[in-house]
């Protein structure tokens, strides 16, 4: 399974505990300090390891990138050329910062629409994680039937009445009004935190997240200066 690194530990545990092997394609920082996908590396890793499934995190956890349309289009073209199905985790899609906008993976092309299973939830944005209210959007009937068959193995893998109405309530106008205020507060917090870290901690850099409420710090210079190995 192709996975970008750094990665969310939940992906690692779920994939490995189900008997699959992870192949990482590292994200790299460009001259402006922005985390980017290495499309050539993705293509090479997929071919070398005969990979046919990839996990795509958008917005990215923990780097906080809200991928631009051209980036998603290019990634999906790599997956298309290699006949690679895509599991797109878009749980952070509502929680973008500043003027950044989330682009649904399935929206960039007809092929992306058909080879992608996209997963969403109000849990991160609206503090509803304990209510078990995630959902998927799958246009390809074959993929939808396969996932439905697997998820039916346990009757616990379903929404309950409380979680269903919590989801509906979160996606009402009042919920989005609250979300607008939350995004404004989080954007200010991120600006303050990143500026403070850069100005007070030598050797530690911080790429400002464009979404999520995660901060992913680069401490490599500090570690090298203090003889600490990574």
Regions found by a protein language model. Give the residues of each.
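PLP-dependent class I/II
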Residues: 2-230
């Amino acid at each position: 399974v192709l996975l970008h690194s750094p990665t969310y530990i939940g992906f690692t545990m779920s994939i490995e505990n189900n008997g699959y092997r992870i192949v990482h394609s590292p994200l790299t920082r460009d001259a402006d300090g922005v985390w980017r996908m290495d499309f050539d590396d993705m293509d090479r890793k997929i071919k070398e390891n005969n990979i046919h499934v990839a996990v795509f995190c958008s917005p990215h956890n923990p780097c906080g990138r809200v991928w631009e349309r051209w980036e998603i289009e290019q990634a999906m073209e790599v997956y298309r050329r290699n006949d690679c199905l895509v599991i797109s985790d878009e749980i952070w899609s509502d929680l973008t910062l500043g003027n950044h906008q989330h682009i649904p993976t399935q929206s960039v092309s007809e092929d992306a629409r058909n080879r992608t299973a996209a997963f969403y939830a109000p849990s991160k944005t609206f503090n509803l994680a304990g209510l078990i209210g995630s959902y998927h959007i799958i246009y390809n009937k074959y993929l939808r039937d396969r996932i439905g068959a697997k998820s039916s193995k346990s009757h616990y893998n379903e929404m309950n009445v409380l979680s269903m109405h919590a989801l509906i309530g979160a996606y009402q106008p009042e919920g989005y009004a609250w979300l607008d205020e939350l995004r404004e507060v989080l954007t200010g917090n991120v600006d303050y935190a990143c500026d403070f870290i850069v100005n007070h901690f030598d050797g530690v850099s911080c790429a400002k997240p464009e979404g999520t409420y995660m901060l992913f710090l680069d401490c490599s210079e500090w570690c090298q200066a203090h003889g600490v190995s990574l």
